[in-house]
């Protein structure tokens, strides 16, 4: 069995006097996870072969044979007919071996002027570029769903919180727009990351470049890269682009996790602000009444998973000298799983948000608790000439009195308010109660970035325009 695992004809077997052990073979093989790079590997190889032919490094007949063989291999992979072999270590050697079996010596010439070091770096960048574009689209879908829900609730009043204590009234639409802003920045980070991903390593070969008269810029143009990696050592050895993407993904998941925490809280019967559609929830095997928000709960958990992948990649790179080291094989599984986790999460969240039922009465009732308009009363006094710190102290005194009596500030009569606040009684008139309503409070925040319904609608319009850019 050992000799079968390390048989003659492998890309590097001639150097060794004894076969590799089966244990080492299985330990070092990557084909069963890096095979997802197969189609981009073929695309990279075709661009490389075309350049080799244009530079007269291989013949036109060789190029035609390579193109014919690769077309057959691509079809086999897409139909699930390709036979992946552990013996052949990785996706690159599996495809090359199959190509050589199909077309003979022309297949052996394909690797002229390149190494698996620059080949895999190119494959990862090609693949990740496409995944960044896909994730960008999914972020847009989620932003769109949030904007739809925000538009429906531009006037829906809820309590805003600090320290999970009622702070000031806001609109639910305004609250949702905060997440739109977060996911907008996430989309910007993804686009920015893409500019550094989209550089061609091919041509760096193993580490020092190649002695063949290659045309790297032609390959970059064929594959849609913005340019080439400027240094061959850097091109094959660094994975900072993957780390950067994973860091951006960790931020995406952090924002999802914050939103998830609120969804779980809002759906709790003790809060009851929203309901999540049944198709996104699960039940209990023992408690018949349960409807559990498993999707947002699981998203919170998966955030830790992506954060872990970021730490794995940072740790992977921190001790590597130049240039390529086998350590870099460990970049793929964290990267692949990060992409899968983020994409799956964004897709399900966009659908889930569209199915949320809002309960405005519960939100309003909660906003009426906790003296949420106390700051408005202080502002009322300030506008009548009282220094803010004095107004703050006076209203805090009034809040303490109302709290002891179990009533809200708005429940005080005008005479009671003046009696309890004798030092500022001369500043208080009948118009004070307009400042103590929830509607008056949110309407007064009528400036860009504020929670006034008109500002919320304007922000939604601007965000929709940004989505179309």
Swiss-Prot record:
Top-rank lineage group of the source organism: Bacteria
The protein's annotated pathway: Amino-acid biosynthesis; L-arginine biosynthesis; L-arginine from L-ornithine and carbamoyl phosphate: step 3/3
GO BP annotations listed: arginine biosynthetic process via ornithine; L-arginine biosynthetic process
CDD domains, alphabetized: Argininosuccinate_lyase
First-level EC class: lyase
Pfam families tied to this protein: ASL_C2, Lyase_1
Any one GO molecular-function label of the UniProt entry: argininosuccinate lyase activity
SUPFAM superfamilies registered for this protein in UniProt: L-aspartase-like
Keywords on record: Amino-acid biosynthesis, Arginine biosynthesis, Cytoplasm, Lyase
EC number: 4.3.2.1
HAMAP family the record matches: Arg_succ_lyase (MF_00006)
PANTHER family the UniProt entry points to: ARGININOSUCCINATE LYASE (PTHR43814:SF1)
Family to which the UniProt record says this protein belongs: Belongs to the lyase 1 family. Argininosuccinate lyase subfamily.
Designated name of the protein: Argininosuccinate lyase
Organism: Burkholderia vietnamiensis (strain G4 / LMG 22486) (Burkholderia cepacia (strain R1808))
